Amino acid sequence: MVGLHFDRGPVKHVDIGWRVPNLLRELLDGIGKEYSLQKCIPITVLEKVLWKYQSIDNVAALSGKEYSRVQLCGPKCAFRILCNIPSDQLVIPDIEKYNEFNVNKTLYEGFLLALDTIQHTFNSQLFNDSPPHELNSKAESSVSHTAEDYFDSYISNFSRISETNLEKLHSRRELKNIECDAKKSLKILNAYDKLYDDQLDELEKKLEDIQYKQHALRQKKGTILSTSEKLNNMIYISKQSRKNIEEVSLLLKYDMNKKSSSVYSGWETTNLLSKSELAFGFNENNNNYNDDSLGEEDANDESENYDTFNLEGKNSRYSGSSVDYISEDTRQQKAKNKHEIGTVLSALKNAHENNITCLDFDEPFGTLYSAGQLDNTIKVWDLSSSKFIGSFNAHLSTINCMQLDTQQQIIISGGRDSLVRLWDIKKFQDYSTNYNDIENYYEETNCIFECDSHSDEISSISYDNFNLLTGSQDKTIKHWDLITGKCVQTFDVSFYLNNSPPFENKFSPTKKNYFAHSEAPTIGSLQCFESALASGTKDGLIRLWDLRSGKVIRILEGHTDAITSLKFDMTNLITGSLDKNIRIWDMRNWSLVNSYGYQSPVWSLDFNSANVVSATGGKTSEIFRRKENNHCIPNENYSFIKSEVQFVKYKEDWLIEGRSNGDIEILTI
């Protein structure tokens, strides 16, 4: 290698590329050992050049995009140094291509850019002609600024720079500083530009996701609407089919009554409609049937083809598949073709030896459960055929009250033996035409639950959603949880009744006491719904309880004697009493809506939205039309009947009466 020597002339500015610092380090470490470069070039000059390129203030050492002018050697010396650098290391890469492959800024670079921006904004706000006492407040307020605030302040600072002012400057140093600051700011702006591009991409993706979710929700909403329409159609078809089934059952019922003798002694079979009469109409002018009506033999042939069907979860042994009927008429309108409201469809003669104390049934044309005084059994009847199915020993003494739950397929009974029992009636609900061994099927082990905490006879019960309320002559009301089988709370009403007058049997015209006990019931009636309980006691007061707190929240006054029955719906509460009055209360404002009296005490009542039916010890049930606000007299002639109506049960336009002689009658209203 030929030795190099320095020119002794004046030192000039030499442009050295951005890779010179590394090359000089290699020259000092490697090349100088093998060649005589160190001998030709003073070591102090090389150290100064290397130190210059390693300086923090050197922009070329940091970025490599600018050239540095140094005053360390002449141009010939610099040329000789560059000539000894390998040619492959002299290639300067394309900065634009380099940036294409390194588009994303590192976290450190972004932090430096943000730090420069914050520092620049902080200084501009802190020292912008502010007095000393305001510096601390401005410094504290600047800390809470967001990156967007710094960016806006950063842009506003450069917007105030005028190009005309730059043209007036003649200082190279100031122009150089402004140029460097502008290039740094340009880097920061490029970083912000990339940042905002990324944020815009994220927002576009979020908008796409939102649009996709919106489309999916609209599809689900459309599915819900279409499914709702299908369900509404199913409900409509189910109601129509149910009406058709009930109409066919009614036709079969009338046909059986036509072929048999009168079910009630002294009544003529002409009082009952036949299937032909309903299907083809009746001529009132000549009291004859139409010529094209079905004959009795045809009816027998068709009745053999009926299969089992299920009506609202209740089993019946009749179904209509080929019987002609008038589909636009309801079963009430069919009965009105010849009979008025109150027509007796059938009767169960001598169902019990003594008066009926309580009954309940599965409507329509389902199963009837009844109990009588001095009879410890519950008897089961088929309403479609008026046949006796069976009975079971439910208590040790008279049964005072019962309630049927067809969904759970249980019946709850309370008796004078101070016991409340729950019975499984699934066997009776699914009975076949063979009635053998059904009566023997029920034994003591078929009682699925027994409440034995009362010390006196049971006078009333109420069941709703696994909550059972029992009222007793021991002046207590007990709340039972049937899931756990435990008594959860007891309401003592004895302190309410201390001043009540003793019951005197002076209300019945026949001087008979229809109660199973010798005096008016202490707790005459109960009804619960969820956490609400209504109770009627012999002091003539109706108390409304909150089962959650166990306290009386309201008392309704108006009756002057013992409450015997009560029932409420979502709007009204109707009560009956031994004071011969029935009162209708509005549960929305607890005001008395209507009140009407009878000549005898009210022993039992039931109602729906159209009628209020009550038993007042007369030969017929009392029917009060709620909309017309008048009483309805049944069409049947009861002048020859000596028994009195003691208990009524009214469901879906079907009324069942329990009489004092043990008979049970089924009527349509």
UniProtKB/Swiss-Prot annotation:
WD repeats lie at residues 351-391, 394-433, 453-492, 516-557, 558-595, 597-634, 640-669. The gene is CAF4. GO terms for biological process: mitochondrial fission; peroxisome fission. This is CCR4-associated factor 4 homolog. Involved in mitochondrial fission. Has a partially redundant function to MDV1 in acting as an adapter protein required to form mitochondrial fission complexes. Formation of these complexes is required to promote constriction and fission of the mitochondrial compartment at a late step in mitochondrial division. SUPFAM superfamilies: WD40 repeat-like. It holds the Pfam family WD40. It comes from the Eukaryota.
